[in-house]
Amino acid sequence: MALINFDLLAELPLAYQAFAPTVDVLPLIPLFFFLLVFVWQAAVGFR
């Protein structure tokens, strides 16, 4: 059984540390599209 050190995967590599705030927001983008569907349908009157 291979043991994986998840602590290594918990942080971005040093070269990408500047992008950490962006990476934190990326998982939320699909939720914004999901909510946009309801806003769009409300705008067109739920046809």
UniProtKB/Swiss-Prot annotation:
- UniProt main location, coarse: membrane
Subunit structure and binding partners: PSII is composed of 1 copy each of membrane proteins PsbA, PsbB, PsbC, PsbD, PsbE, PsbF, PsbH, PsbI, PsbJ, PsbK, PsbL, PsbM, PsbT, PsbX, PsbY, Psb30/Ycf12, peripheral proteins PsbO, CyanoQ (PsbQ), PsbU, PsbV and a large number of cofactors. It forms dimeric complexes.
**InterPro entries (alphabetical):** PSII_PsbK (IPR003687), PSII_PsbK_sf (IPR037270)
Q: Which HAMAP family match?
A: PSII_PsbK (MF_00441)
Pro-peptide region(s): 1-10
Transmembrane in keyword set: yes
Where does this one sit in the cell? Cellular thylakoid membrane
Stretches that traverse the bilayer: 26-46
Q: How does it sit in the membrane?
A: Single-pass membrane protein
The name under which this protein is listed is Photosystem II reaction center protein K
Q: Which SUPFAM superfamilies match?
A: Photosystem II reaction center protein K, PsbK
Q: What does this protein do?
A: One of the components of the core complex of photosystem II (PSII). PSII is a light-driven water:plastoquinone oxidoreductase that uses light energy to abstract electrons from H(2)O, generating O(2) and a proton gradient subsequently used for ATP formation. It consists of a core antenna complex that captures photons, and an electron transfer chain that converts photonic excitation into a charge separation.
Membership in a protein family: Belongs to the PsbK family.
Which Gene Ontology cellular-component terms appear in the entry?
Answer: photosystem II reaction center; plasma membrane-derived thylakoid membrane
Q: Name one GO biological process term.
A: photosynthesis
Q: Which UniProt keywords apply?
A: Membrane, Photosynthesis, Photosystem II, Reaction center, Thylakoid, Transmembrane, Transmembrane helix
